Amino acid sequence: MVRIAVDAMGGDFGPYPIIEGTILALKENPNFKAILVGHKEKIQTLIPHKYNNRIEIVHAEDVIRMDEAATEALKRKESSIYKAVELVRTGEAEGVVSAGHSGATMSLATLRIGRLKNVSRPAIATLMPTYKNKKSLVLDVGANVDCKPEHLFEFGVMGEAYATAIMNVDKPKVGLLSNGEEETKGNELTKNAFTMLKSLPTFIGNVEGNNIFDGSVDVIVCDGFTGNIVLKTSEGVADAISKLMKANIKKTPIRMAGALMMKKVFRSLKKEIDYSEYGGAPLIGVKGCTIISHGKSTPKAIKNAIYQAITYIKSDINTKIEKRLEEVTPKG
């Protein structure tokens, strides 16, 4: 049975949505055990008795707040995220899910659990909607602000493995995010990364921002600085469009009537762009499984983050990443 450690105290709204999301996951999936890490008394009051045999509680006195430095994480051994990560390091859990301090989670997972063989920098990967009824994968979206060409090469290989193992894409197309499709476009980093990525049979060359959403490419590679801006901009645009639509619909009764007739369409669209449908973003390149969830995660988002962790673990993707990197990494 898969064991998932959940940072019960992380997140903007305290333990309630985290624990409620864990219980939702347990209701729907009987094939995993949850280890909730945090203040024992607070957690116990939120757990129905019938789930006691499927939930273990590991007490943690401390919580790393969102406004604290990520460098604090390694010193705070009594914090909920530190203890949750340690459960993976010691083999007591196969994966960890946290909606807490993302920098602390990344640092602890990288330094305490450790990186996979031939991985120099783990990357955060996120799924993006496209209008071709499939998803695209973007990495890195925030783990590494400054990158070297070899890091982007590794991201391409890891993204390729993820698309094959998790997204079930037979021959994923890997693209490098740049300011133009031509090989001569980009900065020094992307030009040098392009040269390295050309050795991958799945590499299709440079892609532009619009290609993230048009379904023409499965894996989009970029540094964490660029990727995080892409992610936050996408979230902002989706939110702005939603609010603009609501404001314009309310202007006339006819529009409101038309909106009611399109309720199913709007519901389907919301599902495509709602972060809670994805649950979280995997930190690819570390041992075990680390899922980083949004601080504002709802119970539904936590439930889906746990499911994402289970899928990640069962896919044996880490073995596939190590094998693929061994095959394609230049020797010497």
From Swiss-Prot:
GO cellular component: cytoplasm
Biological classification of the source: Bacteria, Pseudomonadati, Campylobacterota, Epsilonproteobacteria, Nautiliales
Assembly: Homodimer. Probably interacts with PlsY.
Keyword presence, Ubl conjugation: no
Family membership noted in the UniProt record: Belongs to the PlsX family.
Protein name per the record: Phosphate acyltransferase
Domain of life: Bacteria
Catalyzed chemical reaction(s): a fatty acyl-[ACP] + phosphate = an acyl phosphate + holo-[ACP]
Gene from which the chain derives: plsX
